[in-house]
Amino acid sequence: MAPGATATPFLPTVSNETTLRESFVRDEDERPKVAYNVFSSEIPVISLEGIDEIEGRRVEICKKIVAACEDWGVFQVVDHGVDAGVIADMTRLAREFFSLPPEDKLRFDMSGGKKGGFIVSSHLQGEAVQDWREIVTYFSYPIRARDYSRWPDKPEDWRSVTEKYSETLMELACKLLGVLSEAMGLDTEAITKACIDMDQKVVVNFYPKCPQPDLTLGLKRHTDPGTITLLLQDQVGGLQATKDGGKTWITVQPVEGAFVVNLGDHGHFLSNGRFKNADHQAVVNSNTSRLSIATFQNPAPDAIVYPLAIREGEKPVLDEPITFAEMYRRKMSRDLELAKIKKLAKVENQEVLEKTKVEAVAQPKGLGEILA
């Protein structure tokens, strides 16, 4: 390689390797327990038809959404009002982007702290094990914060289609947050007001076929830090959820045209823990690639995080009000520290194992063993 030249990063989309690279291999306790296509019907599918009615269907929809948020923290919505043509265009452009030659995608490489663009992503910066996915991400709200230099210029129409998609998803998210505000006995706009100037980040995930899917994850187990997330996924399957700390997992049944909705940590705290922050991950497979588009609705960095409603007999889940920026910093620091502790424990266990092997070989056999 010429002096000063840099190696092309490994891209799963163009890999023909039959063995998974070590950097993607998860510890046994993190590996998939349920296949990508063993679907569960436990996550409710809720029709939003009539949600704009003052009474009538809105009351019934509200009850279903609240029940889902108290149980799993995740549900699916249909009849949501997002135009099918917008969904089709967004999905088409996403697939076209990941089909581009590596050099076209890498022009928007976001490594080195760049905000937005393309990356082969680990769940957490500094974590040793990578997730088996490629992503392209951009920040769409507030509008003044859009940096179009970090938005792909291929395929054509990316900007116009993604702007329309972002706009309609913002409307849907605010509508759902209105239902949750009312469920807490607050004004319809209470949660969106608590976000101050709501941020929106769109992450387009592409999970290529994987040579050894039983050894890795497309996206490591986590909860989202923000208020609410809306996920559009194809029909392949791979999104999984748990509500018992990872002991058992279910694979969410893909529903054509539906959005999977899950609450994040911020939404969980605003409800004083009443609504669950969904614990989820993504698994991959060796048969076909998978596409999903996650739209994260987050509060402004300076928004205050504290329960909006505390029911009688409850205590606040937070000791004191903090900003979302501080909440996010603490979450990332905690996750990174846990990753470091686990990595250190793994190294120490390996050293103990190697030492035991050496001692076993060096230990002289007794006379009884020799004559046995």
UniProtKB/Swiss-Prot annotation:
GO biological process: flavonoid biosynthetic process
Fe2OG dioxygenase domain ranges (all copies): 195-299
Pathway assignment: Flavonoid metabolism
Residues the record lists as binding Fe cation: 222, 224, 280
Cofactor binding note: Binds 1 ascorbate molecule per subunit.
Signal sequence segment: none
Molecular-function GO terms, alphabetical: flavanone 3-dioxygenase activity; L-ascorbic acid binding; metal ion binding
Keyword field: Dioxygenase, Flavonoid biosynthesis, Iron, Metal-binding, Oxidoreductase, Vitamin C
EC code(s) of this entry: 1.14.11.9
Cysteine disulfide links: none
Binding site for 2-oxoglutarate: 290
Catalytic reaction annotation: a (2S)-flavan-4-one + 2-oxoglutarate + O2 = a (2R,3R)-dihydroflavonol + succinate + CO2; (2S)-naringenin + 2-oxoglutarate + O2 = (2R,3R)-dihydrokaempferol + succinate + CO2; (S)-eriodictyol + 2-oxoglutarate + O2 = (2R,3R)-dihydroquercetin + succinate + CO2
Tissues where this protein is expressed: Expressed in young cromes.
Keyword Chaperone: no
InterPro entries with a match to the protein in the record: DIOX_N (IPR026992), IPNS-like_FE2OG_OXY (IPR044861), IPNS-like_sf (IPR027443), Oxoglu/Fe-dep_dioxygenase_dom (IPR005123), Plant_2OG-oxidoreductases (IPR050295)
Top-level division of the source organism's lineage: Eukaryota
Entry keyword annotation includes Thylakoid: no
Cofactor(s) for this UniProt protein: L-ascorbate; Fe(2+)
PROSITE patterns according to UniProt: FE2OG_OXY
Purpose of the protein: Catalyzes the 3-beta-hydroxylation of (2S)-flavanones to 2R,3R-dihydroflavonols, which are intermediates in the biosynthesis of flavonols, anthocyanidins, catechins and proanthocyanidins in plants. Can act on naringenin to produce dihydrokaempferol, and on eriodictyol to produced dihydroquercetin.
Similarity section: Belongs to the iron/ascorbate-dependent oxidoreductase family.
Descriptive protein name: Flavanone 3-dioxygenase F3H1
Provenance organism: Crocosmia x crocosmiiflora (Montbretia)
Organism ancestry: Eukaryota, Viridiplantae, Streptophyta, Embryophyta, Tracheophyta
